[in-house]
């Protein structure tokens, strides 16, 4: 080609680049605020570049980035002709990169660890979460987030966003367990006989992290995010009291996370429909003696007969549990014999738990437990009284709404990438998040903390329970993304708003 042709080609190429750089339009959420260095840590799960975990900003192409003007982020190379190092370039990064970048900053990760460790050192049982609640309020104050307290004694309810519908809620439980921690580390529980053995300290830290991200992105929220810091999940039905205190007023959907030792760190797991069982407890007192029946024999027959409820009556495709977990005939082995010899009334106590994945099955099992216990007592000439602890709310089954489940799965794929999500089987554990799921569409999901190198392999409620703290930034980012994307998809303006409602913000690199 002649020399003049080279000059003409260069001019045409420059014009094309200018047109490309100025003609791209972006949705209002496709904006990143911050520096180029901050953008480089927009990863929350394996890979090169910034080395943080998660979404890889360098892999985004024509969906939200104009080819030819992107610059490689996190060591992954650039998009189009602008890739690689050297020279100046412009970054058009979307909600994924901004949320991941904010959560992945070293100072954010350090703050999340510090918050979690402060809570872990001072565990508090149900409705005693005074210091934990104060920590939450102090952190929200520092962010400029308004809140309401007390709700359900020690609970905190905060709002971020427009203050108008739609309203989506995120929940974290705050209470610990009456367990003596056996893990020897710098931040071991300083409250004897109490331990965060179920990860609620991590739940609070992740929700506070989400609050910080959402507050920074408040101008992108097309509605309101409500944050529920709830007491008494382990016992006391704190969720029910939060609802009674107005925590779900105007809320149209709610989400919550629970750490899981069954999944690798930062992997999300959930399922549609029943996820966790409804849970109830029973206590039976069998009276015998005085020339009537033998309470011990009646109790033995009762325990055997209770096992037939599930094995002989339950639909094998509708999992149920009846378990006798406690028996007490006397304070001394000879007491029963003495009572029989003296023809005195004797007493035998037994108790346990029952579980099912639907309210119908739950109440059917409850009815049969009472029938079996009272009937077996009569067969042996005894009397029995059954207590189902009516003054304490049983935990209903936790059921994921199909749409909320789909939302969790979609956001996991978008934010964390392929392989970040797993469908999980239903479990016989129970959660008082179920009270929320009976009021509004709900999505409950797990986030993995399993790390065999660290020893994070023990189940919840174990004195050896621990977590991989690398999960904290991912959990905070995922919480924030769940809420922001829900509002983006469900706000009245979501289907009619312009792609350029907000001015674009560009990052420049030299």
UniProtKB/Swiss-Prot annotation:
InterPro entries: Amidohydrolase, Bact_exopeptidase_dim_dom, ILR1-like_Hyd, Peptidase_M20. Its EC number is 3.5.1.-. Keywords: Hydrolase, Signal. GO terms for biological process: auxin metabolic process; jasmonic acid metabolic process. SUPFAM superfamilies: Bacterial exopeptidase dimerisation domain (SSF55031), Zn-dependent exopeptidases (SSF53187). Residues 1-24 form the signal peptide. GO terms for molecular function: hydrolase activity. Residues 499-510 have a biased composition (Acidic residues). It comes from the Eukaryota. Pfam families: Peptidase_M20. Residues 490-510 are annotated as: Disordered. Gene3D superfamilies: 3.30.70.360, Zn peptidases (3.40.630.10). The keyword Signal applies. Transmembrane segments: none annotated. PANTHER family: IAA-AMINO ACID HYDROLASE ILR1-LIKE 6, PEPTIDASE M20 FAMILY MEMBER. Belongs to the peptidase M20 family. Hydrolyzes certain amino acid conjugates of the plant growth regulator indole-3-acetic acid (IAA). This is IAA-amino acid hydrolase ILR1-like 6. The lineage of its organism: Eukaryota, Viridiplantae, Streptophyta, Embryophyta, Tracheophyta. The gene is ILL6.
């Amino acid at each position: 080609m002649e020399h003049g042709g080279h000059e003409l080609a260069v001019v045409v190429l420059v014009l094309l680049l200018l047109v490309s750089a100025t003609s791209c339009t972006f949705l209002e959420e496709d904006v990143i605020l911050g520096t180029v260095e901050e953008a480089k840590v927009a990863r929350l799960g394996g890979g090169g570049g910034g080395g943080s975990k998660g979404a890889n900003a360098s892999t985004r192409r024509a969906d939200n980035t104009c080819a030819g003007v992107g610059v490689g982020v996190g060591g992954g190379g650039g998009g189009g002709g602008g890739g690689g190092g050297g020279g100046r370039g412009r970054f058009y990064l979307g909600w994924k990169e901004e949320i991941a970048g904010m959560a992945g900053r070293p100072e954010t990760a350090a703050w999340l660890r510090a918050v979690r460790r402060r809570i872990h050192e001072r565990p508090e049982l149900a409705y005693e979460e005074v210091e934990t609640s104060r920590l939450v309020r102090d952190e929200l104050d520092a962010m400029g987030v308004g809140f309401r307290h007390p709700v359900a004694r020690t609970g905190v309810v905060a709002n971020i966003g427009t203050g108008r519908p739609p309203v989506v809620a995120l929940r974290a439980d705050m209470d610990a367990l009456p367990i003596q921690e056996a893990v020897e580390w710098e931040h071991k529980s300083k409250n004897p006989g109490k331990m965060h053995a179920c990860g609620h300290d991590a739940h609070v830290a992740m929700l506070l992290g989400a609050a910080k991200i959402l507050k920074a992105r408040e101008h992108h929220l097309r509605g309101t995010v409500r944050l529920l810091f709830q007491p008494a999940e382990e016992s006391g039905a704190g969720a029910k009291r939060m609802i009674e205190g107005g925590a779900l007023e105007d809320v149209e959907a709610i989400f919550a996370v629970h750490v899981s030792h069954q999944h690798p760190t930062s992997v999300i797991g959930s399922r549609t429909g029943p996820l966790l069982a409804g849970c109830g407890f029973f206590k039976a007192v069998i009276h015998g003696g005085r020339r009537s029946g033998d309470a011990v024999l009646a109790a033995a027959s009762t325990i055997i007969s209770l096992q037939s409820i599930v094995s002989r009556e339950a639909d094998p495709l509708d999992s149920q549990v009846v378990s006798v977990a406690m028996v007490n005939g006397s304070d001394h082995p000879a007491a029963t014999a003495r009572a029989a010899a003296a023809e005195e009334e004797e007493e035998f106590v037994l108790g346990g738990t029952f579980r099912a994945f639907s309210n119908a099955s739950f109440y059917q099992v409850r009815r049969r437990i009472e029938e079996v216990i009272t009937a077996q007592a009569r067969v042996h000439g005894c009397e029995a009284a059954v207590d189902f602890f009516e003054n304490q709310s049983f935990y209903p089954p936790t059921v994921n709404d199909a749409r909320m489940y789909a939302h969790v799965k979609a956001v996991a794929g978008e934010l964390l990438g392929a392989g970040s999500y797993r469908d999980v089987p239903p479990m016989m554990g129970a959660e008082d998040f179920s009270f929320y799921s009976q009021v509004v569409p709900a999505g409950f999901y797990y986030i993995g903390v399993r790390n065999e190198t660290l020893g994070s392999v023990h189940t919840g409620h174990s004195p050896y329970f621990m977590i991989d703290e690398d999960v904290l930034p991912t959990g905070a980012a995922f919480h924030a993304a769940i809420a922001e994307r829900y509002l983006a998809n469900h706000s009245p303006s979501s289907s009619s708003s312009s792609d350029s409602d907000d001015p674009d913000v560009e990052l420049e690199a030299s």
